[in-house]
Amino acid sequence: MPLSLLLTCLSTTVTLVSPAVLDPCSAYISLNEPWRNTDHQFDESQNQPLCDNHMNGEWYRFTGMAGDAMPTFCIPENHCGTHAPVWLNGSHPLEEDGIVQRQACASFKGNCCLWNATVEVKACPRGYYVYRLARPSVCFHVYCGHFYDICDEDCHGNCLDTTECACSPGTSLGPDGQTCFDENECEHNNGGCSEICVNLKNSHRCACGVGRVLRSDGKTCEDIEGCHNNNGGCSHSCLGSEEGYQCECPRGLVLSEDNHTCQVPVLCKSSAIEVSVPRELVGGLELFLTNTSCRGVSNGTHVNIVFSLKTCGTVVDVVNDKIVASNIVTGLPKETPGSSGDIIIRTSKLLIPVTCEFPRLYTISEGYVPNLRNAPLEIRSRNHGIFPFTLEIFKDHEFEEPYRETLPTLKLRDSLYFGIEPLVHVNGLESLVESCFATPTAKMDEILKYYLIQDGCVSDDSVKQYSSRDHLAKHFQAPVFKFVGKDHKEVFLHCRVLVCGVLDERSRCAQGCHRRVRREVGEDEDSAGLQSQTLTGGPIAIDWED
């Protein structure tokens, strides 16, 4: 069975650390390993695949037998010493462009950009390039190097004379005046493709999304109308009917969101990620995660692997409007037959990348006193998982003991201690309370509302923020108040929380109180379709009479 049929959906963009103060053209790390070169084909029978999981956003230069620069065209899988080689999906910059951002893509199972990350590139005065490379979210990924054609001083190849070079079609002369770099035709009008353009060495090709095929012109796409055409685009079974067709999966696999691809079931929860691999797909292989001490356990029908966002080598990153947790399940032959009697294997290796996505933006509502049930807020992402926060009312400024058993009576001029608490503590993430406002009813769209925090700024001078050891937790103190009117005896709080990567110095969380940025950046976040859900607790009657 092709490994591509086992892939869960992946789209990962890695957050970079802040750039170094020194000019990266003179402060870089050389990558000179011969196996990085695009000509080096990986042989699984002789070696283990390599991975660049040691990288952490430093600047690098390709030298020696690794090559001159990153390739700007799709590299087939099982090259550059690994399963999923990484190439630069975009042209190299000119020296006057300074530092630019480009997309880096990893090729795997026929998909030239199954994973992607953002890297930074700079053209240096001496004719070479340096790259600020992010750590891959999963293994096995390696950044590739490539030897580009050079027009030498003796005027061999396509040289016009001893001082001027002419490059072959599909390439252009680099900043050193000698090297011919591949042109990315996809950067110009998407290469003429109606949907997907894939840049190749000295050329390009068009492709279509799932369930669609190229027309005879090789550029435009059309819907697959039945199982007779490319199996309906289905990864496994295609069933035709008078109304059309539908894809079906074998027992143990589930249909993904594209309604065409079958994948291993993955359950995304904030407390744990659960992967369940059908036993017949495993055979005599032993399954483990990036941290090989985390291994699968068989229940007879499935091999199950359960891990958290903080264990087993799981990588957590912020990608646009999502928190993305990634790991990879690897299957290798057992050294001895297992207890289930496996004495043969049907595949030499199994790779199942796993990704869970959680939304970044949450809206939490609570009365002055939590409901006695104290149910946590669980916000469901559009497709994949939940990441819970609670709005707690604490007994004092230590913010260690929230009210649990009894509802206190709060009086005017008392201090109200409240905070945003994550139910899962994950390193590498932080939160920003974008707004907190009070209403006399549980409705968030109540016309009568009073803001304590707005645009990440404390809007009431009586509100005090306390520091917290956890980047995701936020603690505040405010005087107890009520709304004017004898009928207004209850107060509800509503807080809007955004989650970001700690190392992303350009994130909304890092900017903190900044109303202008809130209008510009926040509107983009809202337009991205962030989902929120309201949990309402309380209310409590305020003892406001002397």
UniProtKB/Swiss-Prot annotation:
Tissue specificity of this protein: Liver-specific. Expressed only in the hepatocytes.
Signal sequence coordinates: 1-19
Chief site of localization: nucleus
Xref: SUPFAM superfamilies: EGF/Laminin (SSF57196)
Pfam families: D8C_UMOD, FXa_inhibition, Zona_pellucida, ZP-N
GO MF term set: calcium ion binding
EGF-like domain mapped to chain residues: 182-222
GO CC terms in record: nuclear envelope
Biological process annotations from GO: renal system process
Cell location: Nucleus envelope
Stated role: May be involved in hepatocellular function and development.
The protein's name: Oncoprotein-induced transcript 3 protein
Organism this protein belongs to: Mus musculus
The organism's taxonomic lineage, starting at the top: Eukaryota, Metazoa, Chordata, Craniata, Vertebrata
